[in-house]
Amino acid sequence: MSIPKAYLEHVAIWVKDIHWHIRFFREVFGMEMREVQGTAEEPLQYWTLGGMQFMSKPDFEGPEGRLGHLGVMCEDLDAALAAARRFEVEQMPQGFNWLSLPDGLAVEFIQACPASAVRELLAVNARAPE
């Protein structure tokens, strides 16, 4: 008997400033909106194509109880890092491709090989009705 395969569809995180996170993940990783609870102007929760779910919690303090880090596969590592550095982020001791966001979330940027794999994977929408 073979083991059924699965994959992680999304990661949900509490964020203090949901608009900042939406803008960062859109401008750095090209992650567009898949769904929103509330409105785009005043979202309570926001899901991206690419697996992120941001849950607005303006009084959220620090990374405790959130998660270790996000590993994000990039078509163009250098371009993604350049875009990220336009935001208030800090390089981490783990390496040039590890950045800490202002609220403490750690993000590891990874170069996809081949780069085209990112677009191929993002072209699949398993939630789309048949």
Question: Where do the model's predicted regions map?
Answer:
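Vicinal oxygen chelate
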Residues: 1-4, 7-17, 34-35, 45-46, 59-130, ...
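Core segments of cupin and vicinal oxygen chelate
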Residues: 2-6, 12-53, 79
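Glutamate identity and glutamate-enriched acidic tracts
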Residues: 9, 27, 32-35, 41-42, ...
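Conserved short beta-strand elements that form part of the metal-binding/catalytic scaffold
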Residues: 31-66, 99-114
